């Protein structure tokens, strides 16, 4: 099964965002970028139906990852979310227990880990459809 799609990368740190985008493009994905939570919400308001997956940074200035999720829920915008963070998965699962998170990805991550995570989330989404 071929799993490709449009991925939104939400990351305020430019080097991390560029690295993530380059890895996803290397894996064959088309990528949109947002430098903060406000831009991410704007992109999703206009293109949520096209976006297959969002990689969302947990900690950003302005709107945090948690605030972005809360706003998307208020607006009824749904997209599978992989939360990215330097924090460990267990603490993130506790903190984000009230939100729908498809998976967690601890930074720094390697190409193989990103590939496995993204493809697993997209495969689960395809099976649910």
What annotation goes with each model-predicted range?
Residues 60:
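Receiver (REC) domain active-site loop signature in two-component systems and cognate sites
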Residues 36-39, 64-68:
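Acidic catalytic/metal-coordinating carboxylates
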Residues 57:
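Active-site residues of response regulator receiver
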Residues 67, 74, 78-79, 87-106, ...:
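Alpha4 helix (beta4-alpha4-beta5 surface) of REC/receiver domains from two-component response regulators
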